[in-house]
From Swiss-Prot:
Record family assignment: Belongs to the glycosyl hydrolase 19 family. Chitinase class I subfamily.
Name of the protein in question: Endochitinase 1A
Higher taxonomy: Eukaryota, Viridiplantae, Streptophyta, Embryophyta, Tracheophyta
Function: Defense against chitin-containing fungal and bacterial pathogens.
Protein source organism: Arachis hypogaea
GO biological process, one term: defense response
A molecular-function term among this protein's GO annotations: endochitinase activity
Record keywords, A-Z: Carbohydrate metabolism, Chitin degradation, Chitin-binding, Glycosidase, Hydrolase, Plant defense, Polysaccharide degradation
Amino acid sequence: MTAQGNKPSSHDVITGRWTPSAADRAAGRVSGFGVITNIINGGLDC
């Protein structure tokens, strides 16, 4: 639940504390399940 590198905290995304930057929006990253899926990527996170 802690931000790691260039990934925001999944808790912050879920609770609405994270807001996408202009670069995030340009890359298609907006608040919601899709961003959570990208944060929890099955690597060391799982």
